[in-house]
């Protein structure tokens, strides 16, 4: 059975003390680059090398347990149940935020104003030639908050793509770099847009690269976002199912049905506001 090395990042004495039992702490106490959030300690770990090819690795933020309701035992049990069949295992909460948007980039633009063009440019930088405007993502390939566990091969490609974004943001001197480093609204405060770009790279890899086999922990069994969409659990299920059907069969009727249902739901939400 493949071993799972699952880390919880800590950046203060308080978050160090809150590392959940069963997870290994990943030290970011020096927190040299808080502007990169979790990417900085994950990057340092991966660049150091020494990963076991048959093992799984995960790097969770201090908010993992609060956002998912999962402890280390349940995460590791899911890894064991998979039996090494998958390259990537997903633990994404907020099912409503997976089902309603066409993809995680649209979801990000809904949450962070004026970021869609930056997301698009970043996606094209990471995966040149990707048809960004036709990307459809669902619960089988959407990753929130870097809550995933994967084998080293996936992590290496993830790091390679993220480093393209990292290099542009660090070098500066372009409008794209400025927008990556620019703060956007987040949790009542602000965070650089590049943080939310990095959080979407795993989803992009899974949607664009069919070579990766992924399995998702049931997202409907994890906490939802608390948005107005949570009033419509049946419709959320239908929306996600239609996207999955479209991804597997490419019949345009599934995507048309998704947009029609989403449009009707949008009308209901607008009426509820008035």
Each predicted region: which residue ranges?
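ER/Golgi luminal nucleotide-sugar-dependent glycosyltransferases, focusing on the catalytic module
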Residues: 1-274
């Amino acid at each position: 059975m493949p071993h799972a090395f699952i880390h919880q990042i800590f950046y203060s004495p308080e978050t160090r003390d809150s590392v959940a039992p069963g997870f290994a702490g990943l030290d970011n106490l020096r927190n040299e680059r808080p502007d990169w959030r979790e990417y900085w300690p994950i990057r340092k770990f991966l660049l150091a090398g020494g990963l076991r090819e048959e093992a799984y690795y995960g790097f969770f933020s201090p908010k993992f347990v609060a956002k998912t309701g999962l402890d280390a035992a349940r995460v590791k049990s899911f890894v064991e149940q998979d039996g090494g069949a998958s390259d990537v295992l997903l633990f994404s909460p907020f099912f409503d935020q997976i089902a309603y948007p066409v993809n995680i980039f649209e979801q990000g633009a809904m949450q962070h104003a004026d970021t869609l063009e930056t997301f698009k440019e970043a996606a094209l930088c990471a995966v040149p030639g990707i048809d960004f405007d036709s990307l459809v993502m669902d619960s089988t390939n959407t990753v929130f908050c870097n809550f995933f566990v994967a084998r080293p091969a996936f992590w290496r490609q993830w790091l390679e793509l993220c480093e393209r974004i990292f290099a542009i943001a660090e070098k500066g001197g372009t409008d794209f770099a400025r927008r990556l480093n620019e703060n956007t609204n987040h949790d009542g405060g602000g965070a650089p847009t590049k943080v939310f770009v990095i959080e979407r790279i795993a989803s992009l890899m899974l949607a664009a690269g069919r070579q990766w086999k992924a399995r998702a922990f049931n997202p409907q069994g994890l906490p939802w976002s608390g948005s107005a969409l949570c009033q419509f659990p049946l419709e959320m299920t239908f929306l996600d199912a239609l996207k999955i059907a479209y991804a597997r069969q490419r019949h345009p009727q599934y995507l048309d049905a998704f947009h029609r249902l989403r449009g009707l739901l949008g009308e209901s939400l607008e009426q509820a506001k008035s």
